[in-house]
């Protein structure tokens, strides 16, 4: 088997230290911690009150509101970081051979925020129509959808 050469040409990052690679790197070299009080949900009933949350993230920097509503937060991070990496590599995707560009992405669980919102919403609905899920529930939640969104761009 012949091994193929892989080249990393650009980097992007969305982290608790910053929403860009330079912000993240600056935090790392200055010994900054990304930990802080949990703000994404009510954690008052949990022993742990601190987490490393991404703060100040705006998905509208890379997509419109309608498109963003179809994605879970983890996918929005992935799409934004990929856009940063493409920009960092100074790639013009219109001029590149897309058959020579790949996306490698890993996620342990996928859209847990979407899952949580849908399950809680399902339990609360008590009308004549009955409970229903958002039509984007499964597409927003599956763990490989972030790579799909990146690839479609």
Give residue ranges: language-model regions.
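Conserved "HGTGT" condensation-loop signature of ketosynthase/thiolase-family condensing enzymes
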Residues: 1-153
């Amino acid at each position: 088997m012949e091994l193929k050469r892989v080249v990393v040409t650009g980097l992007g990052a969305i982290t608790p230290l910053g929403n860009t690679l330079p912000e993240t790197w600056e935090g790392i070299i200055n010994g900054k911690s990304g930990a802080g009080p949990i703000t994404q949900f009510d954690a008052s009933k949990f022993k742990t009150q601190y987490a490393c949350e991404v703060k100040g993230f705006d998905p509208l920097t890379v997509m419109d509101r309608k498109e963003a509503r179809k994605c879970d937060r983890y996918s929005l991070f992935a799409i934004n970081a990929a856009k940063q990496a493409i920009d960092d590599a100074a790639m013009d995707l219109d001029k590149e051979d897309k058959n020579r560009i790949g996306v490698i992405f890993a996620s342990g669980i996928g859209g847990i925020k979407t899952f949580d919102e849908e399950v809680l919403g399902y339990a609360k609905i008590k009308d004549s129509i009955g409970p229903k899920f958002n039509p984007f529930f499964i597409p927003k939640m599956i763990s490989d959808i972030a790579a799909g969104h990146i690839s479609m761009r």
